[in-house]
C-alpha cells in the first residue's frame, strides 16, 4: 500500500503509463470502461494496452452507435449497450443537452448544463452478472465514469471484489 502511494505521489504524470507500470507491463488482459461515452478513454487505453480486450459499457444508444462506427475495425473492443448498477432492473437515463452528462441520477436543473432534454428507459445489470455473462474471471482495469452512480456500480460488484479479481479501479 505504501509503495503504491509513493509511486503515485512521486511518479504520476500520465495515468495510462502509471497503470501500465502498476500492471507490470502485462501484454494481455481485460479493461472495462464503464460509462464509455464516445470512446476517448477507450482510444487511450487501446494505445497503451494494445493486447488487452476492452469492454465499452454505455447505456445511451446514440453513444453506442458512435462507438460502433469509431471502433468498427478494432477486434479487441466490445461495445455493450447497458448500464451497470446495484441490481438487474430497468432505470431511467436522463439525457442532457451535453451527452457526457447523461445520468441515471435526476439532474439538478439549476446547475449549469444539467437540464435534461429527455429521458429513456435503459436496462441495468450488476458488474458481477456482467462478468458471469461474459466469462470474465479477472478485470485488470475497471474505469468508472457514470455521473454519480459509481456507488451503485460498486454495490453490484461484491462477488468480484470479494474474490480479489480486480487489479485497478
Q: What is each residue range found by the language model?
A:
Residues 1-168:
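Phosphate/nucleotide-binding beta-alpha loop and adjacent structural elements of enzyme active sites
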